């Protein structure tokens, strides 16, 4: 049953939607419009790229997002360097010495990792947490798309501007006040895309339909008013989950015709095959591992060995977990690390009588906050290949951002998770 977990189908449906966006270049159009809207001064260009990258990373893989934003960013850097050289500004625009190139590349990589935290389908560690938490603690509150969005989106809204300010004002100031003709580069790429085609429009329709269906599937309590969920109104709330919506959206992509005469549909199997099937198999293995922890008694055994931590303040324990996961994923896969650590953290929660969400959620979030090394994440490796940054630069900037991220995640989880999920911090969901 571990390989048929609903969270696997949720992520699979999200992958299919992401493939459709990439096939018809919808993601590129969205990114270019965001960058164009946010302005053309060096700092605002960095902000535009970071917002666009983070938004796309909420829905498609951070690797695909970075691969798409990377050449656009390089085009802006090359244009800026060319114009500054023509004006004989005296600024060294060579790769490795051009601060604007360094900060833009770092901004793209870091925002790709941060953006994925916002949604349940944004990055694998989020889904790993949801699946293992459900397996180990079936009586705990359900973690659906909207539930995660309530904590993931606030984190991104706080962390992204903090990262932008840290990069552009403290760590790597661009060193230039304006980029002559910077807007033209973005407008040129938009002109190349042409008018929005049928494939893009249909993909956008399915994307919006699925996102809204996720958000409004269950009742939303605003305090003064309860918005009824569509699944309850239709009387099917016991049979419909977020994964149902995701797979239904994926089926629509295979059925909606772009050109019926030529048998061209929004998504075909050639593109569907490109989703990362290895990640899906890894999910199943992780959920099976968590079930093994429970049924074999290993979780209880680990919990008994960790009982000496009972006296440690909860907030200190959360911070230590955040720092551990952040720096551990600098040299290991965040998906594999999260899969390995979640059952252990579940056992730790039982041993210390702390609600497991307070330990497992920050671990999942922190697994996406490795900013120091090129090997830490695919986005880091991609931008490192530009030549505009060196390992010491990334390590110096990323070290302090790792610390900042751990602190932000700790505070947000400590003060938001309890009221949002309505849990008792010192009670186990048994």
Region locations from a protein language model:
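Interfacial loop-to-helix junctions that mark the boundaries of transmembrane helices
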Residues: 1-6, 141-153, 194-198, 223-245, ...
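Generic alpha-helical transmembrane segments of integral inner-membrane proteins
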Residues: 12, 16, 47, 51, ...
């Amino acid at each position: 049953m571990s390989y048929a977990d609903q969270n696997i189908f949720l992520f699979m449906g999200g992958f299919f939607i992401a493939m459709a966006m990439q096939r018809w270049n919808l993601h590129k159009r969205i990114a270019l419009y965001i960058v164009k809207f946010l302005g053309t001064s060096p700092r605002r260009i960095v902000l535009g790229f970071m917002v666009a990258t983070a938004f796309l990373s909420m829905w498609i893989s951070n690797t695909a997002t970075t691969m798409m934003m990377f050449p656009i960013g390089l085009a802006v850097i090359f244009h800026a360097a060319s114009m500054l050289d023509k004006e004989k500004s005296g600024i060294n625009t060579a790769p490795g010495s051009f601060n604007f190139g360094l900060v833009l590349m770092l901004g793209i990589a870091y925002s790709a990792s941060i953006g994925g935290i916002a949604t349940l389908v944004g990055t694998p560690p989020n889904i790993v947490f949801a699946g293992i938490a459900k397996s180990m603690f079936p009586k705990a509150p359900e973690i659906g798309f909207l539930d995660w969005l309530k904590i993931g989106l606030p984190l991104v809204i706080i962390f992204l501007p903090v990262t932008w300010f840290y990069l552009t004002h403290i760590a790597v100031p661009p060193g230039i006040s304006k980029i002559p003709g910077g807007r033209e580069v973005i407008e040129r790429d938009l002109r190349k895309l042409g008018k929005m085609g049928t494939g893009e429009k249909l993909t956008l329709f399915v994307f919006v339909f699925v996102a809204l269906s996720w958000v409004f599937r269950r009742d939303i309590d605003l305090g003064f008013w309860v918005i009824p969920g569509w699944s309850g109104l239709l009387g099917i709330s016991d049979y419909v989950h977020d994964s149902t919506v995701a797979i239904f959206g994926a089926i629509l992509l295979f059925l909606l015709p772009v050109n019926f005469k030529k048998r061209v549909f929004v998504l075909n199997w050639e593109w569907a095959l490109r989703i990362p099937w290895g990640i899906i198999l890894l999910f199943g293995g992780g959920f099976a591992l968590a079930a093994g922890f429970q049924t074999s008694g290993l979780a209880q055994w680990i919990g008994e060995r960790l009982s000496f931590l009972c006296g440690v303040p909860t907030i200190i324990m959360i911070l230590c977990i955040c720092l551990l996961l952040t720096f551990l994923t600098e040299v290991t896969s965040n998906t594999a690390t999260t899969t390995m650590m979640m059952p252990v953290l579940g056992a730790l929660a039982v041993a210390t009588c702390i609600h497991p969400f307070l330990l497992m959620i920050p671990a999942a979030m922190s697994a996406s906050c490795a900013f120091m090394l090129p090997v830490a994440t695919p986005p880091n490796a991609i931008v490192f290949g530009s030549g505009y940054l060196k390992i010491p630069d990334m390590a110096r900037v990323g070290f302090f951002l790792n610390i900042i991220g751990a602190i932000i995640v700790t505070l947000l989880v400590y003060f938001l998770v309890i009221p949002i999920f309505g849990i008792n911090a010192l009670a186990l969901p048994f």
